[in-house]
C-alpha cells in the first residue's frame, strides 16, 4: 500500500526545487532511476518512489506544471494514473505537486484514493508568509501563466483550503503548512531524518548561456 505525498502551492513557491533535492538525495544514496510513464521511478533498499513530472533541459525535476500526461490533467485522471503505477511497479511513495485551488476536491478523499492502493495521505501547503513575497517570487521567476487575481484569491483562501482537508477527519493523513523559505532539503529531513546541504539548484539554461558568454569574453580579453 502506498503513501500519497502532495505538495501544494502557487507557482514559484519552490515546490519543484524541494522535490528535485529529494530526488538528488536518493540518487546520492545509490538509488536506481527509471523513466516511466509520467515521471521517474527511484528504488532504494527495495522501496520504490514515484515522482510525477519531468526534467528540464538543465536536469532539474519539475512537477505538476509540466503536465507530463498531456491533456490528462484532471485530478481523477492523475489519481488513476498513480493507481496504475502502484499496481504495475509496486510503488511505495507517490510524490506530486498540486495547487491551492484543488485542495478542497472530493477527489482527495480516502474513499477515492484507497481503491487505487493509497492508504496514507500527506498534504503540505508550501507557501510564503505574505502575499507580497509570493507575488515577488513569481515576478523574479518570470511566471506568466498564472493570473495575479487568481494567485491572490488562492493565497487568501489558503487556511480555508487546509481546513477542508482537515475536516475530512480521515485516518493516516497529515496536513501541514510549510514555509516556501525552508531549507531545500526539508523533505529529506522529513522522510529520511537526514540532511543534504550539498544540494545546489541547477542553473537555468539562460544562466548557463550567460556564463558561457562571459567565459568567452574573458578568454578573448
What do these predicted regions represent?
Residues 7:
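Hydrophobic anchor at the beta1->P-loop junction of P-loop NTPases
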Residues 14:
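Conserved glycine(s) of the Walker
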Residues 17-30:
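A conserved segment at the C-terminal end of the G1
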